[in-house]
Amino acid sequence: MAPSLDQQLFFFLNADRGRPWADTLWAVFSSLDFWLPLLIVAGLLIAWRGGFRGRAMLTCLLLSIGIMEGGIINPLKKTISKQRPYHVLSEARVVKLEDTTPRWLAAIRPPVIRAGNPAEAPEVGKSLPSGHTSNMFCFATVLTVFYRWRGALFFIPATLVALSRVATGSHWPSDIMLSAPGSIIVTLLLLAIYGWLWRTLAPRLVPTLAVRHPRLIAPA
């Protein structure tokens, strides 16, 4: 049977091209724990020096990711139960960073690569939606709404992270194609709700702050 278009695209991105540095690069983009220290430092700096807009952005971002993870992504994973590529295809390559301390050393080490194993497939699949893709596009959407074109630049790393999830064998191309726009739509809806709540509740709860900032998301 000929492979589906989804499988063809998967094999194109997941293929071994004889360039270990490319596998390492994709694994770096795909690894949350590699970037976590930098994200924490950036978040603390924005909370400290970012003013009202920066703190509002962080609050909206954390709320949105929490709501999406707990209320949408995880429930959908259990409901859809789509198996990851490496639980379906023995030809799939699973590419991960080496387990190093400190974590940044993994970026200069060869990645750990193994073949897919359908025999290890769990009872409940977790391929759709892609949590990494959803969270990154949520991040990019929030930044764009708060910082306009400067924030929109974050769609570049968000796209690279999404592609890396396919290149490292964790997701099908269709997973990220559905997760990215879905995340943008949900995030925009949540931001609209946050803005309405601020306009409705802030004058009563924090009147002084509401006078200075009548809108949660002010024009850039």
Task: Report each predicted region and the residues it spans.
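Membrane-embedded catalytic cores of phosphoryl/pyrophosphoryl-handling enzymes
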Residues: 102-220
